[in-house]
Amino acid sequence: MKILIMGLPGSGKTTLAQMIAPRLNAVWLNADEIRKQADDWDFTPEGRKRQSLRMWTLAEEAMEKNRTVVADFICPTKETREQFNADYVVWMDTIKECRFEDTNKMFEEPTEYNFRVTSKDAEMWAYLITQEVRDLIWLEQKRKA
């Protein structure tokens, strides 16, 4: 299962991902770390599409090894979210603007998501999301058996 935790910078994506990934024994893909490894700091629309594709590729590689993936990144547009193609989307709707004006202008609130986080209480949200995702993973495995 590929889980996307998306939202504006400063919304709590990384904090939540850090709590969820170990609870699900998942591979954690943090966009900042992936950008650092790729040495790609281009935040234009094309750079963001490239980052989304990079995150998708890494997630798919982990899933081929039967791993659950938790990816946290802005994923600011419908196009980047569709490109990443998550099985489960968490929208971090905890702030309305970030410190980066270009990101504020580009960011499109998602219309499709599985879970909407509305406050910065990572422990509570991690518990709720983990419970729901564990059930979905169990159902998915049962269907495959």
Model segments located where?
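Conserved lysine of the Walker
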Residues: K13
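Short, structured coil segments at secondary-structure junctions
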Residues: L24, N85-D87, E112
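Walker A (P-loop) ATP-phosphate-binding motif of ABC ATPase nucleotide-binding domains
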Residues: K2
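Hydrophobic anchor at the beta1->P-loop junction of P-loop NTPases
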Residues: I5
